Amino acid sequence: VDENKNKIISVLNSRGVRREQLDSETLKDIENIISACGTEPIKLVGYWGVGEKQEPTEIDRKALDKLSDIMKMTDDRIKVHLILADKHGEFNGYENDIYLNKISSIAGERNISTAFLSAIYHEVGLDAADLTNVSDDIWNKFPECYRCIIEKRAGIHQKKCEASEDAKRYLHMTQVEKQKIGAVYPNCIWFTYGDIKNLKDLFPRPVISIWPIKRGKSVLPWFS
């Protein structure tokens, strides 16, 4: 077990995979998950977004190859699972199941499992009102440094509202999903392609930020 644990942590904390050194709390969380899973594979779960493009490109394929490589490097002790974020796309003004269906197919060829976010919403009883009825309570409970970072990022890839409104909605959505979607995936390690420095509280724990294709190249495949 210790050998498997060390191999998994070594891969996830390698310079070619993670964007930043994993801190002691994250490492401890990962160790606990590995222990809890015993001989079962550990799920590495992340959202895969959607934008305007209809067809997956070479960037998508290379990013999926990278996720497949992570599984291979751990001798399949890690299994990658993608949440295809059709609902996020819908909220941002993109309704593009064609692209996500093709991503699901390409991922399957690499033994990467997928689930549509809309199906998970249905499973846990979430609807649009839960995500769009945004109050200031969640926004105000986060420190100003969080809010400033989120406001700077808001509005870049959405077409429905102003950046300030989008920032509040995004923060609200992350907290609802953190509780509801996180419960569907217990004992999992989460990943994101974004920079999570100072923003780890937005995600289920533990969460790691990984390079999508290669070290030093930061892109969101669905927008590239």
Regions found by a protein language model. Name each.
Residues E55-D75:
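Histidine-anchored nucleotide/phosphate-binding helix
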Residues G38-Y47, H81, S209:
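Short hydrophobic beta-strand segments
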Residues V1-P41:
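N- or domain-start disorder-to-order transition segments that initiate the globular core
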Residues N32-P41, M71-I78, F203:
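Flexible, charged surface loops at secondary-structure boundaries
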Residues P41-L44, R61-L64, I78:
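Anionic-ligand binding region
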Residues H88-F223:
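A substrate-binding/cap region within the structured catalytic cores of diverse enzymes
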Residues W48-E55, K87-N92:
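Short acidic, S/G/P-rich loop/turn micro-motifs used as interaction or catalytic elements
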